[in-house]
Amino acid sequence: MPWQSVRILVDSVQAEPLSDALMEAGALSVSLEDADAGTVDETPLFGEPDHPSAELWPHSIAVVLLEADADVAETLRAAAAQAGVAAPLDYTVETVAEQDWVRLTQSQFDPIPISARLWIVPTWHEAPDSRALNLKLDPGLAFGTGSHPTTRLCLRWLDANLRGGETLLDYGCGSGILAIAAAKLGARRVEGVDIDPQAVSASRDNAALNEVDAHFGLPGELAAGEYDVVVANILTNPLKAMAPLLAGRVRSGGSLVLSGILAEQAEDVMAVYRPWFVFDAPASDEGWVRLVGVKR
């Protein structure tokens, strides 16, 4: 059965309420794109997968998928009325041939090489190198995967620096990918915490999928103690606020690995942590940085 793809020009005020209302009105999917993409007015937005950006583009295109027999004008009118915005007038409609959407989505994600020996492999793919350390994880998970520069930066540090036998804490574990990688790289004891119970559940499932011994829970469930390595791939403001907490979890001589930080934010973050840590030069990837400090 074919579908109708409707592209609607919306502003930042309309975008989210209209998108929600369209889903309730029967849309099969709604996604937002920058209407100014590819022009001098393009607005880049940055966000880690488990902490998406709260910003919206000044002008967006809402791409709406409707069933073939849906009344487009009536659907838009009803959704706009529910959202409390003016009914959109600037839109186009095209017919989209039926496709196997699951197969199409899967075809867009290939295994991700992190280093010479470390790969992230979607569960539906064969590992390109069966001798490598292959992390089984599906791109598109709500809690983050190795497709984001901050995650890659942290994974590369773990791959280059873990020698085996370490204790490691992943603070803000999301999908558990960093903790799982640490376990595969030989860390002796690996723990992860997240404030979101669903992230904790996802991390446990992913650890089981990868057949590693890593323990996950909420922050209040974490026992007292210090670690050889603490990694936190979250965002700048939470990292700054949690400086005393994270510093207290790293043993003297141990390493703190921070990411989720834009390049222009790096100095501010290091300044907050310098009472406890001596930092290496930041490593960067696509405008994001990784900071590594050694505890005094």
Swiss-Prot record:
Keywords: Cytoplasm, Methyltransferase, S-adenosyl-L-methionine, Transferase
Pfam families xref list: PrmA
Documented EC number(s): 2.1.1.-
Gene Ontology terms: biological process: methylation
GO CC terms in record: cytosol
Chemical reaction(s) catalysed: L-lysyl-[protein] + 3 S-adenosyl-L-methionine = N(6),N(6),N(6)-trimethyl-L-lysyl-[protein] + 3 S-adenosyl-L-homocysteine + 3 H(+)
Positions annotated to bind S-adenosyl-L-methionine: 151, 172, 194, 233
GO terms assigned for molecular function: protein-lysine N-methyltransferase activity
Location of the protein in the cell: Cytoplasm
Family: Belongs to the methyltransferase superfamily. PrmA family.
Its biological purpose: Methylates ribosomal protein L11.
Name this polypeptide is given: Ribosomal protein L11 methyltransferase
Protein source organism: Thiobacillus denitrificans (strain ATCC 25259 / T1)
Gene transcribed to yield this protein: prmA
